[in-house]
């Protein structure tokens, strides 16, 4: 990231014979003031593995200087009527563990093919379920909320990953540690 004020970027290009060229660029950066709008992202909440599709269809959300990604997500979910439960804080170590909204889980219908996969993978069904919330350890031992930014799964909490103008963030529910949504890392 660039610091406020003058920044120097030095680049050395080398070919396979060892010849090189050095370039130096001075970049002046004027940082936005804390709380100033710096862009817009698109946020959605996907519960396809439960047969529910989008719990929150893609919507535009303003982002502000000094605000963590977790803060922007909480603001978007709460403005859509969700109650959020999480560990850590919006500033550090944030993990979204559960979202609540009246009737959110009433029409759960886990696809049969996914049930077969979970059974063959050896995951334990917990039997936990709440018609008014969806969260960690509901249905299976490997369930919970993960997220993608611009289609790529990210490591770490939402408080620790940067976002920028134009990014797309999708919260995705998994029943199998991400294996069922393409986000599993061994």
Tell where the protein language model's regions lie, with residue ranges.
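Ubiquitin-like/PB1-type beta-grasp interaction modules and other compact soluble beta-rich domains
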Residues: 1-186
């Amino acid at each position: 990231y660039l610091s406020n004020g003058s920044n120097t970027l030095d680049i050395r290009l080398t070919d396979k014979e060892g010849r090189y060229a050095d370039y130096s660029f001075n970049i002046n950066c004027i940082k936005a003031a804390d709380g100033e709008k710096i862009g817009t992202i698109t946020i959605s909440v996907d519960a396809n593995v439960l047969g529910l599709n989008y719990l929150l269809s893609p919507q535009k959300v303003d982002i502000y200087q000094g605000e963590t990604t977790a803060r922007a997500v909480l603001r978007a979910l709460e403005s859509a009527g969700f109650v959020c439960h999480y560990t850590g804080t919006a500033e550090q170590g944030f993990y979204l563990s559960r979202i609540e909204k009246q009737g959110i889980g009433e029409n759960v219908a886990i696809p049969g093919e996914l049930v077969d996969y979970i059974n063959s993978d050896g995951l334990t069904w917990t039997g936990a379920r709440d018609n008014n919330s969806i969260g960690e350890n509901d249905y299976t031992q490997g369930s919970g909320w993960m997220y993608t930014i611009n289609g790529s799964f990210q490591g770490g909490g939402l408080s620790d990953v940067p976002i920028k103008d134009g990014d797309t963030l999708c919260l995705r529910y998994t029943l199998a540690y991400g294996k069922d949504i393409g986000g599993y890392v061994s």
